[in-house]
């Protein structure tokens, strides 16, 4: 099996590459990543000498580069992690999110059509569903929950998902989509909630919590997410959307308190920021 993994130098993508090379030593994994601020090539250092791994620095928006890679590698499958994913950044500069998340996805699917891949998998987010009511902790998102986006980021991911499904219905492209809740674990980008709180607590810095801190998120360990994608790309039904979650709901304030407790730090008051957009 020859798999192109886009965005593989990022947090979830790199963990997925490690998982796949460890579980399937005969698979060939090609990482396509343009190394934006969220990508870190040193993350992939443990697999750089693996003969079944190749890294290519290119953007999924570069049609010529993508087609050239497909011609060289003849992939059986594409797993697309490549995305701009920070909500606040999408509010400041939405265009780059449209370019990468929508145009980049269309380039990949056109390449998949042209070169006849066996499966295209789109890694999406539960943010396309919007927010659950704070007073209804018993509710969960389902695959048939209506899309209700709240930022340029989530809108761009929802648009990409719809485009992927349209390519399946129009051209018969064999696709699957996964929408996951918040991940945590190794190589998490430091601007995200959990690594930021850990770093600040260790250095006795303020712990910035957005809004009231009562926003509820479902948290999933990144390796569990990788296992879910592995299962979907090998056994999932073409044309289906799969939600991936941990049923591990915590408010942001609960997360901060857990981190302070585990680090044996005093339960200091959090700094409230006037924003509800950061994840």
Indicate residue ranges for each PLM-predicted region:
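N-terminal Rossmann-like NAD(P)+-binding domain of SDR-like oxidoreductases, especially those catalyzing
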Residues: 1-183, 223, 252, 261-262
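Active-site helix-initiating loop/hinge in glycosyltransferases
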Residues: 185, 189, 218-221
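Short histidine/acidic/glycine/proline-rich micro-motifs that form metal-
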Residues: 35, 182-185, 215-216, 246
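Short acidic-hydrophobic sequence patches enriched in Asp/Glu that either
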Residues: 36, 189, 193, 251
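C-terminal substrate-binding subdomain of Rossmann-fold SDR/epimerase-dehydratase oxidoreductases
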Residues: 3, 22, 29, 58, ...
